[in-house]
């Protein structure tokens, strides 16, 4: 099974705990060693589905003080907060320390949520997508991780799944 993939990325997913990430790749065409050539998304099982939103943006705002939630607003009008959970993390806040501006925006593809909260325990079940995402308990796993913390789990990727930013297929790939 592992020979079907050109590369893999290690995550820590296990059944009920997928945190899927979309993988982007770039070939250094101009040879300058900088990430300034065209980037390609490696499509996964959700590519092309009506629930999948391309060119989605989320802007995050620096909290006014330590141990505060981080506000966010998305390009489709949704908004909310990234809750500060002091029981699980010790950093001052979740806003990236290396960003000096008071807000930053991420642009990419948004997958439909598959998170379900158990009404009795309060725990969240983060269900997997079929294939094509890092840190996802899908059917593209090269190695399954620990059932306790997912350590050692890896997803496989094919460069032939690369698509342009607008979602069109790359032509002429081997």
State where each predicted segment sits:
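Short, small-residue-biased leader/transition segments that mark boundaries at the very start
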Residues: 3-4
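Short loop/turn segments immediately following beta-strands, especially the blade-tip
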Residues: 26-32
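Tryptophan-centered short beta-strand motifs
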Residues: 34-42
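Short coil-to-beta strand junction motifs in C2/discoidin
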Residues: 15-21
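Low-complexity, serine/threonine/proline-enriched polar segments
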Residues: 45-159
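Mid-length scaffold segments of soluble, non-membrane domains
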Residues: 16, 32-35
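Noncatalytic modules at the cell exterior or secretory-pathway interfaces
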Residues: 170-173
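Short, flexible loop/turn elements at secondary-structure junctions
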Residues: 11-14, 27, 46
């Amino acid at each position: 099974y592992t020979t079907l993939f050109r590369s893999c990325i290690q995550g820590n997913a296990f059944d009920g705990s997928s945190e899927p990430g979309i993988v982007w790749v770039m070939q250094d065409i101009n040879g300058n060693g900088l990430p300034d050539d065209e980037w390609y998304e490696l499509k996964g099982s959700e590519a092309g589905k009506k629930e999948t939103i391309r060119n989605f943006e989320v802007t995050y705002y620096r909290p006014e003080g330590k141990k505060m939630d981080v506000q966010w607003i998305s390009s489709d009008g949704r908004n909310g907060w990234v809750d500060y959970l002091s029981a699980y993390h010790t950093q001052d806040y979740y806003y990236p320390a290396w960003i000096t501006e008071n807000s930053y925006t991420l642009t990419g593809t948004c997958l439909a949520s598959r998170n379900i909260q158990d009404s009795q325990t309060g725990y969240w079940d983060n269900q997997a997508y079929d294939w094509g995402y890092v840190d996802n308990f899908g059917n593209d796993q090269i190695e399954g991780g620990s059932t306790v913390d997912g350590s050692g789990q890896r997803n496989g990727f094919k460069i032939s799944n690369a698509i342009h930013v607008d979602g069109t297929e790359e032509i002429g790939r081997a």
